[in-house]
Regions:
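Beta-strand-turn-beta hairpins that frame and shape the catalytic cleft
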Residues: 1-4, 114-120, 218-222
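Alpha-helix termini
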Residues: 23-33, 162, 191, 196, ...
Length: 253
């Protein structure tokens, strides 16, 4: 029993539909158990060209599971009509067609962050830096050096662990940068742990999805950044709050 976590769908309804299908398969349930809730780390919109279908799928999932969502920087930009890169004319047109849609109601009360059982869930980063756009939590970026940037404020792992500690939190799960990363605060210092995804099982003839996983024990304070749930090999995660599993899937040909 635990939570499925996904981020950066970017209007890719095919990818989020694949996730929804995968977590119902016997193989997934045997490996991870019952899914109690879904956690969306933001960026449902922009870049892709199926925003309506994506938001319809999110509304469907909210009826099937307890769904918690936090705001992403592209969600923030879309809602506030801020120009950001990455969307082609077709994507821009289809997003503009969504203005005024009741499907956008899910953003009405969407928070910037959420926490549960000692873990902070946020799109970008944990720092309280005021209300300037690029310093908001949904725009912050995990990096090796800190400072302001045209793409959002860069923070380091030590800064994140300090911010968590002040709030009595132990772990953080974020998205935003579309690449998995794991930083563990060990007695010997902060260590970036390589993430090596391996097949969950030998692919059988009746397996609908090929699932790869990398499991991380949550026995020390940990920063976990989840890859993007878009494209041909959507990435997401599962946690029971004792172990965190990075997951990548691809559909059977």
């Amino acid at each position: 029993m635990g939570a499925v976590i996904f981020s950066d769908v970017h209007a890719d309804s095919v990818a989020i539909r694949a996730l929804a299908s995968c977590i119902k398969t016997p193989l997934f349930r045997q490996a991870f158990g019952q899914v109690d809730n879904l956690i969306n780390l933001g960026d449902l919109v922009h870049r892709g060209d199926r925003p309506q279908e994506t938001l319809e799928m999110i509304h469907t999932l909210s009826r099937e599971y307890r769904l918690v969502s936090v705001l992403g920087n592209h969600d923030h930009a879309f809602l506030n009509r801020l120009l950001v890169s990455g969307s082609d004319p077709a994507s821009t047109y289809r997003h503009e067609q969504m203005r005024g849609s009741p499907l956008l109601s899910l953003f009405d009360t969407m928070p910037m962050e959420w926490s549960d059982r000692g873990m902070l869930f946020v799109h970008g980063g944990p720092l309280d830096l005021g209300k300037q756009t690029l310093r908001l939590k949904c725009w912050q970026r995990l990096s090796h050096e800190s400072g302001d940037s045209f793409a959002g404020f860069h923070y380091t792992a030590p800064m994140a662990f300090e911010a968590l500690s002040v709030r009595g939190l132990t772990h953080m799960c974020c998205g935003h940068q579309h690449q998995n990363i794991c930083c563990r605060k060990t007695p010997d210092g902060i260590v970036e742990k390589p993430i090596e995804l391996e097949p969950l099982s030998v692919k059988k003839e009746d397996d609908e999805y090929h699932i790869e996983v990398a499991r991380i024990p949550l026995d020390v304070p940990t920063l976990l950044r989840v890859g993007g749930c878009h494209g041909d090999e959507p990435e997401f995660a599962f946690t029971d709050f004792t172990t965190f599993s990075f997951i990548r899937i691809n559909s059977r040909d």
